[in-house]
């Protein structure tokens, strides 16, 4: 924890076997405006390298993303995401480069607490931004308890965004969601509770 509002995150692992060699690293920087708890943001960068020992193939992947959530008012919440994925791989002698970008936003309105309704829109681009796929959906949610929410929704149209969107369903069609909001203070309270027993 860097300060009252800022937190840095880092994780790395490396695995080597007779069949495969894999390394992965994740770096993140999180912000929470603790004075009013109305703004959260997270920037993340992930790197993965895979080298199968027998084939000579390889895969190098980079994913960068930024997420933000803003409680604009008591009833209105807005969140958005920007992400990009770069992939270089060699398979069966052929080398390929892939780059895709994702931008998305969602607004939720609490019309009759604990019920809320939401609208979401997204765009996925590739081939130097020349190719675009769009997505849009509607959602109905209910707060089950403090910081716990369940939802059902329908994406009117959408796309697959492998490796880019970790929390949202982007495929067309119906979906069910469940969310739990927490921070590092939860783990502190669990430790204190365990020590008191």
Role assignments for model-derived ranges:
Residues 1-197:
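Gram-negative and organellar
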């Amino acid at each position: 924890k860097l300060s009252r509002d800022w937190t840095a995150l880092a994780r790395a692992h490396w695995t080597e076997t007779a069949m495969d060699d894999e390394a992965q690293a994740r770096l993140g920087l999180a912000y929470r405006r603790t004075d009013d708890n109305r703004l959260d943001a997270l920037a993340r960068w992930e790197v993965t390298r895979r080298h199968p020992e027998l084939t000579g193939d390889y895969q190098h992947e980079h994913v960068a993303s930024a997420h933000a959530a803003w409680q604009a008012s008591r009833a209105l919440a807005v969140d958005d995401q920007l992400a990009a994925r770069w992939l270089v791989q060699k398979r069966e002698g052929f080398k390929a480069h892939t780059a895709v970008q994702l931008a998305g936003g969602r607004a939720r309105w609490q019309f009759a607490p604990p019920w809320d309704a939401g609208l979401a829109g997204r765009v996925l681009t590739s081939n130097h931004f020349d190719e675009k796929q769009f997505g849009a959906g509607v959602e109905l949610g209910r707060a089950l308890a403090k910081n716990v929410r369940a939802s059902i929704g329908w994406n009117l149209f959408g796309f697959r965004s492998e490796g880019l969107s970790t929390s949202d369903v982007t495929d067309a069609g119906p979906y069910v969601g469940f969310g739990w909001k927490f921070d590092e203070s939860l783990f502190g309270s669990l430790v204190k509770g365990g020590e008191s027993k």
